């Protein structure tokens, strides 16, 4: 299991690499461009194969591919927060991949498993164990209204799971006040490469709304790089 520099979780677990969404600011694609060859060699060794051309092509092009070597990683003994898909969006996973992942998660109720997607309707397709937190990534931009509606419906379907927003990168001041009523946690972060922090007034607005609604808020370190005098807020929901 990989320790991570992502400050709102302890480990990352990436049984799948690759995404078809095509966000221009995607950090995962940039990481994959640097490290796909190492991952390819690692997976070949695990599979005890000399070559696998479909695997090589998918890794090189950042198309979704299941990695057995990552899936089989040993989980930590101590209860931990594990981000399941930092190198993919589950919208593009094959259903049998997800079913294998969820079956494994059931074996580790002591851990909290966090998912993120830009397509919240995908949460309606599976039965997630209660120790899964289901996150939706928004940038705060206009044009995301339909996905907010999807989120509202998915939240009702999966009402036993904790839902959260990740505003990262936070690129515009589209307010989510009406939708914040349905969630327990908000993460706010800056665009990392190239670095682009959200405007200070946007952060202050999010702080105001989450305080008013008693929602936990986590402001990432990369925001304080631009605004070191902001109050340090790194909260987690009550069951952690």
What do the PLM-derived regions correspond to, one by one?
Residues 58-225:
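Conserved AdoMet/S-adenosylmethionine-binding subsite of the radical SAM
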Residues 26-28, 41, 109, 180, ...:
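Compositionally biased, intrinsically disordered low-complexity regions enriched in proline and serine
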Residues 1-81:
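N-terminal [4Fe-4S]-dependent radical SAM core
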């Amino acid at each position: 299991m990989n320790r991570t520099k992502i400050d709102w979780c302890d480990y990352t677990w990436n049984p799948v690499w690759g995404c078809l969404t095509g966000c221009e600011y995607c950090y995962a694609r940039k990481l994959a461009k640097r490290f796909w060859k190492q991952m390819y060699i690692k997976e070949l060794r695990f599979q005890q194969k000399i070559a696998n051309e479909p695997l090589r092509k998918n890794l090189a092009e950042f198309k979704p591919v299941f990695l057995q070597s990552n899936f089989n990683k040993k989980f930590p003994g101590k209860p931990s927060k594990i981000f399941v898909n930092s190198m993919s969006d589950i919208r593009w996973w094959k259903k049998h991949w997800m079913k294998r992942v969820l079956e494994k998660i059931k074996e580790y109720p002591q851990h909290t498993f966090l998912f993120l997607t830009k397509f919240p309707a995908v949460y309606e397709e599976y039965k997630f164990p209660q120790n899964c937190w289901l996150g939706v990534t928004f940038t705060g931009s206009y044009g995301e209204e339909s996905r907010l509606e999807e989120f509202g419906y998915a939240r009702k379907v999966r009402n036993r799971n904790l839902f959260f927003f990740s505003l990262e990168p936070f690129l515009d001041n589209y307010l989510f006040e009406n939708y914040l009523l349905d969630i327990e946690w908000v993460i706010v972060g800056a665009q990392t490469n190239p670095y682009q922090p959200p405007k200070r007034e946007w952060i202050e607005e999010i702080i105001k709304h989450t305080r008013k609604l008693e929602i936990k808020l986590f402001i990432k370190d990369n925001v304080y790089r631009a605004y070191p005098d902001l109050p340090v807020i790194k909260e987690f929901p009550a069951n952690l």
